[in-house]
A protein has these predicted regions:
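Conserved N-terminal entry element of GNAT/NAT acetyltransferase domains
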Residues: 1-29
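A conserved beta-strand-loop-helix scaffold within acyl/acetyltransferase catalytic domains
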Residues: 25-91
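Conserved acetyl-CoA-binding loop-helix of GNAT-fold acetyltransferases
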Residues: 87, 92-106
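Conserved GNAT acetyl-CoA-binding A-motif
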Residues: 106-123
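A short acidic (Asp/Glu
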Residues: 126-130
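Conserved catalytic-core motifs of GNAT/GCN5-like acyltransferases
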Residues: 134-157
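A conserved mid-domain beta-alpha-beta active-site/ligand-binding segment of alpha/beta enzyme cores
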Residues: 155-175
């Protein structure tokens, strides 16, 4: 379990963040599909979760408020990728997402892996750019023509979601 501080309150003439405890759990077994279901509709690319993903949830006050998966980074030995990060809308904007993925990334890094996250979400990009825990390693727009010779191009032809024509930002976790 990992403690996460977030949120705001006004005290003595300045804004301060109250402590919000969010516990992080790895989800295993039969609960995998059930846990992802309420988050699926809030993900900007599609509603699918990689079947091989390790799943983690953030729980605040008895409510599951955040979800992410961790998958093998394609074609890169020793690397894992944060996959399908979602914070429920009522809990967005107070720092839960970044602290949640920091806790998950720290766990994965402690297992000997490098960790990557690629996103197009402006708020997450801004937060990670200002974080000492993440290094921006790539930014740009992926064009469909760039994908045609790659092994996963067939997945796109079958209707898989992608970030083509969106500004994307890729970050590496630095423990």
């Amino acid at each position: 379990m990992t403690r996460i501080n977030s949120g705001f309150f006004f005290c003595a003439g300045e804004w301060k963040r109250p402590e919000i405890r969010v516990d992080v759990y790895e989800v295993t077994g039969k609960w995998r599909d059930e846990v992802w279901r309420p988050f699926a509709k809030h993900h900007y690319l599609d509603h699918n979760l990689n079947r091989t993903a390790r799943q983690f949830v953030g729980v605040y006050d008895g409510q599951v408020v955040a979800h992410t998966g961790v998958i093998q980074f394609p074609m890169r030995t020793g690397w894992k990728r944060i996959h399908r990060l979602v914070v429920l809308p009522d809990y967005q904007g107070v720092g839960i997402g970044v602290r949640f993925i920091n806790a998950v990334a720290a766990l994965v890094a402690s297992e000997g892996y490098n960790v990557n996250l690629t996103t197009t979400t402006p708020a997450l990009v801004g937060a990670l750019k200002h974080s000492e825990d993440w290094a921006l390693v790539r930014k740009g727009v992926v064009k469909m023509g760039d994908l045609k010779d790659r092994p996963y191009a067939s997945a796109k032809r079958l209707g898989a979601a992608d970030s083509s024509m969106r500004p994307t930002f890729s970050f590496n976790y630095r423990p």
